């Protein structure tokens, strides 16, 4: 006989996930959220918690936090039928900006309660979901560098800087919706206009049914690293990062040599890579 699998006798139809680490989460804001969503099961964000065991299969999930928390929830529930409401409390709020969600808490709460449900576009690279972008090569290393700079994690910053310095130009070949080849320091496939510390990568939005391939979102190590660190430390979102872009639904990338692949700011392996735009099963709660 196998071991029994325990689940709560009842699951909630509404769940509020709070991130206490979000920059905009104050005691006053938390109290306002708890009052407004008193009819929800309220939990603190814990990436190791089995949230699926707490919520009914089509129950509404409202997440209040920064990009890391919000996008964790979106990736986790990408293939489910849950409606997801977002209350942005981070510094950059890349996904919320891309979806046209308000930054004001009162407006965001109204939409999270009674917004229009709509599927959005999510990216997948070798089966791994990404919300903002897939980056191959130096740009991916730089995203991680920018995150460490943003958080002032100087120990990690040194290690990430070493990865950036070690990055080299590679040969690439594209097939599928885009046919082409060449040499590059990095390739970027975006779903939002910015990533990480509001580092600009194009004009994409998850409201469109496609992703964008940036041909030269930073052509040299100095260009890419300079923009990443400047954006992270000064909280600036300049418009000089986007070069020529191509729209696509699916493509394959081969490189020589094999190069690291990042989904958002997470290392997910090395090339070759298959990258695709897919409509989410989950529905985001958006302005009507």
Question: Where are these predicted regions, by residue range?
Answer:
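ATP/nucleoside-binding phosphotransfer catalytic cores, i.e., glycine-rich phosphate-binding loops
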Residues: 2, 178-181, 215-288
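Hydrophobic alpha-helical segments that either span membranes
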Residues: 64, 69-79, 83-95, 102
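Short, glycine-/small-residue-rich phosphate/pyrophosphate-handling segment
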Residues: 91-132
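Short glycine-/acidic-enriched loop or helix-start segments at secondary-structure transitions
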Residues: 26-27, 72-75, 95-97, 198-199, ...
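ATP/NTP phosphate-donor binding region
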Residues: 1-64, 71-79, 106-110, 284
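ATP/pyrophosphate-binding catalytic subdomain of soluble kinases
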Residues: 126-215, 219
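Short, well-ordered alpha-helical microsegments
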Residues: 51, 70-71, 196, 270
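A short, compositionally biased
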Residues: 114-121, 163-171, 246-248, 253-257, ...
């Amino acid at each position: 006989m196998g071991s029994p699998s325990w689940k709560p006798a009842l699951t909630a139809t509404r769940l509020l996930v709070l991130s206490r680490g979000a920059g905009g989460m104050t005691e006053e804001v938390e109290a306002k959220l708890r009052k407004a969503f008193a009819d929800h099961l309220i939990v603190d964000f814990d990436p190791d918690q089995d949230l699926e065991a707490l919520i009914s299969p089509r129950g509404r999930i409202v997440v209040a936090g920064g990009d890391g928390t919000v996008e964790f929830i979106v990736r986790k529930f990408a293939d489910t039928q849950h409606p997801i409401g977002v209350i942005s409390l981070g510094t950059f709020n890349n996904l919320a900006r891309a979806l046209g969600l308000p930054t004001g808490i009162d407006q965001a709460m109204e939409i999270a309660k009674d917004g229009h449900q709509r599927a959005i576009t999510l990216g997948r690279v070798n089966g791994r979901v990404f919300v903002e972008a897939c980056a191959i090569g130096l740009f991916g290393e730089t995203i991680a560098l920018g995150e460490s700079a943003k958080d002032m994690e100087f120990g990690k910053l040194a290690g990430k800087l070493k990865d950036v310095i070690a990055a080299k130009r590679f040969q690439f070949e594209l097939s599928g919706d885009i046919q082409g080849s060449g040499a590059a320091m990095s390739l970027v496939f975006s779903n939002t206009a910015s990533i990480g510390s509001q580092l600009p990568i194009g004009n994409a939005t998850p409201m469109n049914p496609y992703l964008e391939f940036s041909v030269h979102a930073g052509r040299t190590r100095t260009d890419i690293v300079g923009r990443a660190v400047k954006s992270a430390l000064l909280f600036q979102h300049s418009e000089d990062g986007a070069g020529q872009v191509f729209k696509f639904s699916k493509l394959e990338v081969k490189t020589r040599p094999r190069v690291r692949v990042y989904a958002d700011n997470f290392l997910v392996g090395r090339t070759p890579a298959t990258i695709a735009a897919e409509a989410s099963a989950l529905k985001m709660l958006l302005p009507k």
